[in-house]
Amino acid sequence: GEKFVIIEFFKGLDISFKLDGMGKIFSGMVSVLWPLATLYAFSYMEHAAKKPVYFMFYTLTYAIVLGISFSANMETLYLFYECLTLATLPLIIQPMTKQSKKAGRIYMYLSLFGSALAFFGMMFLLKFTDGTEISTDFVSGGNLILLSQDQESLRFAYFLAFMGFGVKSAIFPMHFWLPLAGAAPTPTTALLHAVAVVKSGVFALMRLTYFAFP
């Protein structure tokens, strides 16, 4: 699909969207599952406290996941990936029990750690692409291998980004936040496991592996 630029900071760094085959599949899956999860959430949260606030973040999470689906490059993916942390944290701690607060803290700490890893990995890549015609746009098959001047550093950048984006996909050894998140309301755990967060993590890793690096 055609790339749609929202904000261009300078050449090679922009926030932009593009709808390709992989984005269509992921956004389509989310768009089918989300209304079903929402119908259940309405029933489950009928007598819950602060219900309007809960559903505000619930809906915001949907918009953010679509932003992840349509991200045209690593910078846009990173932005929405971090927004996903901020939008889902209130959903986890909503009951305000001791267990849910603990789950929220661990989720936030691990997410911030992953954010730092992904950020440094992305900065490495932006340094490599500076002054070249190669961008961090997602291209089928990847194009960053063309930055052949320092393959060791390129692999290190990939490792950092992979581990950073991998936090939300609950890959070992940063997986233990997911069982703890069971203290959240059931619609939230459905969101974390089946619809939004873990799937977004896997989607980000697939983008990184098959559409940025070869």
Regions found by a protein language model. Name each.
Residues V53-Q149:
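Alpha-helical multi-pass transmembrane bundles of energy-transducing inner-membrane proteins
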Residues G21-S31, M74-A87, E152-V167, P214:
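Structural signature of hydrophobic alpha-helical transmembrane segments
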Residues G1-M56, G131-S148:
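Transmembrane helix-loop-helix hairpins at membrane boundaries of multipass inner-membrane proteins
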Residues D14-L19, W34-A48, S153-F156, L180-T188, ...:
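Short juxtamembrane and helix-loop transition motifs at transmembrane-helix boundaries
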Residues E8, V53, A103, F156-P214:
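Short helix-boundary/re-entrant hairpin motifs in multi-pass inner-membrane proteins
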Residues K24-S27, S31, F55-Y62, L112-S115, ...:
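Residues within membrane-spanning alpha-helices of integral membrane proteins
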Residues S27-A41, Y62-S69, S115-G121, S200-R207:
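Helical transmembrane-bundle signal
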Residues G1, M29-S43, T61-A63, L84-Q94, ...:
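Central hydrophobic cores of alpha-helical transmembrane segments in multi-pass inner-membrane proteins
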